[in-house]
Amino acid sequence: MSQEQAPQVYLISPPSFDPQAFCAVLETIFAQTPIACVRLAISAHSEDQIIRMCDPVRELAHRHDVPLVLDEHYMLAERLGLDGVHLDDGAKTVAAARKALGEDAIIGSFCGTSRHEGMSAGERGADYVAFGPIGANNLGDGRQVERDVFEWWSATIELPIVAQGALDPEGIASFAPITDFFAIGAEIWDHEDPAAELARLCAAISAT
């Protein structure tokens, strides 16, 4: 990552949402904050439900020239006209997703706290890797990624890196010099005004 370039915002959807209401919030966000990519982290297991949720968001995102990727379901991504897929299992299915979607698709991989897993994902064709959480949390085993993983990666590896999970203004300010993207989602959706909360978090990027 170039130290002269500020990290970009990668927006993660809530796991469930009303498409019309979500698109209204997205319109506000797009008007206020530059968004590099939107990820649909939909928890639904019904193909029809995923399609109903994806279609209006795709139309809106593409109208604003914002790429849209889908969590996990890489077999659906191309059919739905999406730009790619985000995988949560590290390097395990990157090669299969790349084979299914081709070279032009965006394929990202969440690699938890493991630098080795991130390197493996990159070798298998990932376009970016995400590590996290970066802050203290009580989810899973409670582990958080060490800052030196980002320091080493940003100094050594050209593949873009994403900071994800337990983001707050202090963590964002700390990691801004050593990451390419901040994946922001759960941090804003419980707020009455998600767009305003996103802007508040993004202020920590510009403050560095």
What name fits each language-model region?
Residues 181:
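C-terminal binding/interaction regions
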Residues 94:
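Short alpha-helix immediately C-terminal to the canonical SAM-binding loop
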Residues 131, 162-166, 184-186:
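Glycine-rich beta-strand-to-loop/alpha-helix junction loops that act as flexible
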Residues 144:
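Acyl-donor (CoA/ACP) binding surface of acyl/acetyltransferases
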Residues 1-91, 99-127, 141, 152, ...:
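Conserved N-terminal beta1-alpha1 strand-loop-helix module at the mouth
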